[in-house]
Amino acid sequence: MAQPGSGCKATTRCLEGTAPPAMAQSDAEALAGALDKDEGQASPCTPSTPSVCSPPSAASSVPSAGKNICSSCGLEILDRYLLKVNNLIWHVRCLECSVCRTSLRQQNSCYIKNKEIFCKMDYFSRFGTKCARCGRQIYASDWVRRARGNAYHLACFACFSCKRQLSTGEEFGLVEEKVLCRIHYDTMIENLKRAAENGNGLTLEGAVPSEQDSQPKPAKRARTSFTAEQLQVMQAQFAQDNNPDAQTLQKLADMTGLSRRVIQVWFQNCRARHKKHTPQHPVPPSGAPPSRLPSALSDDIHYTPFSSPERARMVTLHGYIESQVQCGQVHCRLPYTAPPVHLKADMDGPLSNRGEKVILFQY
């Protein structure tokens, strides 16, 4: 913060009269002005007790040896009160900030620098200490870190490359007011050495790792995992319709709490997997209505031999779903995988003639 310069406290005193009651004393840190009693001598720039004059009596009135000329308007001061700052005098109405033109008659303090008068806010804004990183003002209540005569906010004292805030006692490098942690400072040195070995001209600023160079590569997108209840709803819908429309997708999204896009991708991946593991069947006659489910899956659903109420919760799925399904970008997990059940040839029903293996999964 700027050190106090030539100046003193700004107070108000009368030209002549008896001792008045005390006013509020100002609080200035640097370059404050003092308003003293005008008796032809300049008082030292030290805090003085401000006072208010009482009207002078005719008997005690003594004509002044010289005229009091206002430093602002240049006119003689004939008012009862005047303001005196750093051996200069003003009309009460003429003392104002040279930047914002705010009258200082009601202020407790003012600041003077190079014969210019400033209010407290404009003085510290122009001459106060500023952060070397962000350029904002550093106030007396702020915690700071200092390096090579520069002051930094705690949050601003961070590595230019990786943006990591440095701690007390940690090693760092300072390159053209850019703070670097030890790792990126060593990287800068390596860049300079490599450029010198290759004969390439590289400036110091160009050797500093940029923010883009320090950004880590984006991690792989996290796979979506489903709960048992979500899988149960989607698998039941897949058994009925493996290509649901937008309205059905929205219903599934409301039931499962997933987004429509995630559910749509799950159905797409499962259709592709089912198509991959399902053997090709002859094309039905043109007169027959097309079925949205493969014939093998339709037969398994309509002619499943497990019809007891306890096993009604089990859905017959063909080999397109395993215990852990890797469906493209969607990671599907089933809570439990029942062992495969081999249907014997002597069982009744259409499946007994085919002799196929049906894998049952419980969810």
From Swiss-Prot:
Disordered as annotated region, ranges: 19-53, 203-224, 273-297
Subunit structure, as described in the record: Interacts with LDB1 (via the LIM zinc-binding domains).
Stretches the record annotates as Required for interaction with LDB1: 55-194
GO molecular function, a single term: sequence-specific double-stranded DNA binding
DNA-binding interval(s): 219-278
Keyword Zinc: yes
GO cellular component terms given for this protein: chromatin; nucleus
Protein's UniProt name: LIM/homeobox protein Lhx6
Matches recorded under Gene3D superfamilies: Cysteine Rich Protein, Homeodomain-like
Keywords, ordered alphabetically: Developmental protein, Differentiation, DNA-binding, Homeobox, LIM domain, Metal-binding, Neurogenesis, Nucleus, Repeat, Transcription, Transcription regulation, Zinc
Segments of skewed composition (Low complexity): 42-53
Record InterPro entries: HD, Homeobox_CS, Homeodomain-like_sf, LIM_Homeobox_TF, Znf_LIM
